Amino acid sequence: MKVTSFILIILFGTLLNAQNRQRPVSVELGKFFNEDGKRMLYGGKKDYQHFDVSNLSLEEDQFHYGLGREAFPALLEPEFTSIQKADKQWDDDDRFLVAKSGNDVKAYSIKDLTRHEIVNDELNGKPIMATYCILADLGAIYTRTYGDKVFTFALSGYTYYDPEVWDGLDGFVFWDRETESLWWPLIGKAVSGKMKGAKLHIYDETKWEDTTWSTVKSKYPNAKVLISGQDFERPTSWRKYEDVSDVKGL
């Protein structure tokens, strides 16, 4: 049994390495470049969309893709419907993330999160985000408040892997609109920008779960369910935090 398990681990690692080699490498695509003494990472067609990654703590040659930071519609003002209306759309075995606080319950289908990847939301008045990475098959609920500052997250258009982390799984790289720092959820922290080193905070794990539509209906009949197919006009400007020294260690 131990030998079989060892062989399976080796085969799994070999498969992941092969998959990573097949994905487009960002450096080879010219996504990293120098400008005005800074190391930059392509973020979109507009000059203001590029990321300053001069203090990046990750390896450039382990980044994949480079679709642009607004390629995925990471929701800013999500809309919801009732269990009764949503029940017409979902099958009992459809997968959902559910978060609760007091009487406030939100349900996010994995199918919708696959499209959005991030949903910036509030739960009982507190800023949270629901996230899902299809490559790593990982869903989670995070808080978005650091001290007195609220952060808003989106997808950078890149994935990243490290052979020493999660057996080399390729995972999405986030960015925040307030400081344009990059965050890698597989290690749970910011990896460049003003917030480098700051930790992603998982929402109280006793108050959210990865479950099915059948369970959502039976346990949370008053839950608000994310409406499918939402999109929005991507913002061209956003509030910026110039000084985060008082919150990045929180």
Regions found by a protein language model. Give the residues of each.
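Sec-dependent signal peptide recognition
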Residues: K2-I9
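Hydrophobic h-region of N-terminal signal peptides that target proteins for export
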Residues: I9-A18
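Mid-to-C-terminal functional-domain signal that highlights helix-capping/loop sites
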Residues: Q19-L250
